[in-house]
Swiss-Prot record:
It comes from Burkholderia thailandensis (strain ATCC 700388 / DSM 13276 / CCUG 48851 / CIP 106301 / E264). Keywords: Cell cycle, Cell division, GTP-binding, Magnesium, Metal-binding, Nucleotide-binding, Septation. This is Probable GTP-binding protein EngB. InterPro entries: G_ENGB_dom, GTP-bd, GTP-bd_ribosome_bio_YsxC, P-loop_NTPase. Its cofactor is Mg(2+).
Amino acid sequence: MAFLLHQARFFTTVNHLRDLPPTVQPEIAFAGRSNAGKSTAINVLCNQKRLAFASKTPGRTQHINYFSVGPAAEPVAHLVDLPGYGYAEVPGAAKAHWEQLLSSYLQTRPQLCGMILMMDARRPLTELDRRMIEWFAPTGKPIHSLLTKCDKLTRQESINALRATQKSLDAYRDAGYAGKLTVQLFSALKRTGLDDAHALIESWLRPAAADEDHAAVAE
């Protein structure tokens, strides 16, 4: 099966809101704590080894990185890799800059159609993960959570983590969050959940094409 995400390439790096590209294509943001496996997951989803840089130093990635998706001449969408958060040794000024950059981008970018929130399956929904959800909540746009590194858990532990996270997300819905809140298990190493993640992300990027595919299957 050919995936749209496999046609991804580096587009630009942004350090300030004023530098966001004046593009019109839909965007999907990828967010997560430092060491949640965000860069590795992006690389696996896009079937590339070094598309997103996975730093060995937590908190090193301090910019918003854009990747275009689709034909090089006419990209159809952008993947947006947000700075990892939660690393204690990052200076206070840098943390403040990241928070302003992240919250403003998530709340005001009209091209943004959804957020993929990466959380370590062993430690889901930390305080900072919840803050990301709460920043994004006013938009009413969907959030899909990937519980990464689930290969480090037993099957029963994975099931328990998935159920507990879904229950916590349901509480946001009960409190009035308008957007869809979904979650799945994911392992870049074992490729667990890869097809499900592909299908969901591509349905956000090109819903018309996804509807056509579903209609064709139904026939």
